[in-house]
Amino acid sequence: MAQAARLSWVLVSSRCALTEGLLTRPWQPLSAQSRAGFTRVAAGSRGAAVRKGSPRLLGAAALALGGALGLYHTVRWHQRSQDLRAERSAAQLPLSNSLQLTLYQYKTCPFCSKVRAFLDFHSLPYQVVEVNPVRRTEIKFSSYRKVPILVAQEGDSLQQLNDSSVIISALKTYLVSGQPLEEVITYYPPMKAMNDQGKEVTEFCNKYWLMLDEKEAQQMYGGKEARTEEMKWRQWADDWLVHLISPNVYRTPAEALASFDYIVREGKFGAVEAAMAKYVGAAAMYLISKRLKSRHHLQDDVRVDLYEAANKWVTAVGKDRPFMGGQKPNLADLAVYGVLRVMEGLEAFDDLMRHSHIQPWYLRMERAIEEAPSVHHVNPSCKD
C-alpha cells in the first residue's frame, strides 16, 4: 500500500511524462506584482513598504541577485571567450568527438524529447538512461530532481547540465565557439526565487541565448532578427506549447487510458508500478488535466488551442522557407518538433495532423533528423 500511495503522489504532484504529471510541480513564474516589487527595490524606491521576511520580497531579492549574477557571467564571457578562441588549435579533433554524453530522461517527456531532437540532428552520440518515475534512483546523484539531466565528460572534466533549454543552448554554444564546455555552462547560472505560492523555484539566466561573438553570431544567423526570432519561439515552445500537451492527451477518460498505456510501455516501470500507473495514473491525470485547462485559460475544447498554436507556428515559419531556420532547422524548429513528437501514436496527434496546417513542416522535420549522419545511442537495460 505504501508503494501505491507513493505512486499516486508522484502522478498527482509531479510533471513530465507526456505532461505536467510525472516529474515535479509546474514552475509558477513571479507575478507582475512581484516583478513590480522587485523593480522598486532595485531602484531604491523608499515608498515600497514590504513586510520583513515576505516570500515576495525574498523572491525579488533572489531575482535581483540572479540578474546581477547573469550580467556578471555575460561580461566575463566576453573577456574570457576571446582568450579561449585565441588558444584554439586548428588541428584539434571535431568537438563532438571529444564529448561523452549521458542523458537521464523520461522518454515521453516533451522536454527530454527536445534534447533528443537536438542531439540527433547534430549527430552527437549519447547514452540514454531511462529514469524510473516513481523511485528515480537513477538520478539520486543529483540534487536537481527534474529531467532531463545531461552528464557530459570532456577529457577529465565531468559536467552536469540541467534544464532542456540550458542543455541545448550550452551545447550549441560549445559546438559553434569551441570553448570548453566547463566554461560554457558558467554562462547559464541558476537562480532561486519564491513564487506567489511561497515555493522555491529555480530558473537559469540566459537560457535561450547562445554565447557567441559577433562574427560567430553573424555566420550562424545572418542578422539580429533571425536570432531574436529563434529565441522568441524557443521560449514560446516552453511557455505555451508544452502546456497544451496534457489537457489534450488526457482530454477524455479513454484518451487518458491510452496515454498511460503508452507511457507504461515506453517508460521504466516495475510490474506493480506499471499496473498502478496505467489505471490510477490515467484517472488522476484525467482530473488534473481539467485543472490545467483552467490554469492555462484554455478553451472548452482544448483541441482548438492546439490547432491554433500549430497554425500560429506554421504562419511564423511562412511559405518562403521550409524551416524557421531557413534551409535547415534552427533551435526553435527542434524545440517545437520535440514537444509535439511526444504525442505520436495518440488520438491528439492524429487530430492535430488532420485539422491543422502543420503536417508538411512536421514531415520535413522528420526527414531532416533522419537524414542527419547516424550516431550510436546506447540504452542500457537496467533491472528494477
UniProtKB/Swiss-Prot annotation:
State the GO CC annotations: cytosol; Golgi membrane; mitochondrion; nucleus
Induction cue:
Constitutively expressed. Not induced during tissue inflammation. Down-regulated in the absence of PTGES.
**What reaction(s) does this enzyme catalyze?**
prostaglandin H2 = prostaglandin E2; prostaglandin H2 = (12S)-hydroxy-(5Z,8E,10E)-heptadecatrienoate + malonaldehyde
Which stretches of this protein does UniProt put in the Cytoplasmic compartment?
74-384
Q: Name one GO molecular function term.
A: lyase activity
Q: What happens when the gene is disrupted?
A: Deficient mice displays no obvious phenotype and are fertile. Loss of PTGES2 expression does not result in a measurable decrease in PGE2 levels in any tissue or cell type examined from healthy mice. Injection of the diabetogenic agent streptozotocin (STZ) at a dose to induce type-1 diabetes to knockout (KO) mice aggravates STZ-induced liver toxicity associated with high lethality, despite similar glucose levels.
Which positions are annotated as binding glutathione?
V147, D163, S164
Task: Provide the transmembrane region boundaries.
Answer: 57-73
Q: Where does the record place the site Cleavage?
A: A86, E87
User: How is this protein's activity controlled?
Assistant: Isomerase activity is increased by sulfhydril compounds. Dithiothreitol (DTT) is most effective, followed by glutathione (GSH) and 2-mercaptoethanol.
Q: Where in the cell is it found?
A: Golgi apparatus membrane; Nucleus
The record's comment on protein family reads: Belongs to the GST superfamily.
Entry function? Isomerase that catalyzes the conversion of PGH2 into the more stable prostaglandin E2 (PGE2) (in vitro). The biological function and the GSH-dependent property of PTGES2 is still under debate. In vivo, PTGES2 could form a complex with GSH and heme and would not participate in PGE2 synthesis but would catalyze the degradation of prostaglandin E2 H2 (PGH2) to 12(S)-hydroxy-5(Z),8(E),10(E)-heptadecatrienoic acid (HHT) and malondialdehyde (MDA).
Q: Please give the name of this protein.
A: Prostaglandin E synthase 2
Organism lineage string: Eukaryota, Metazoa, Chordata, Craniata, Vertebrata
- By which gene is this protein encoded? Ptges2
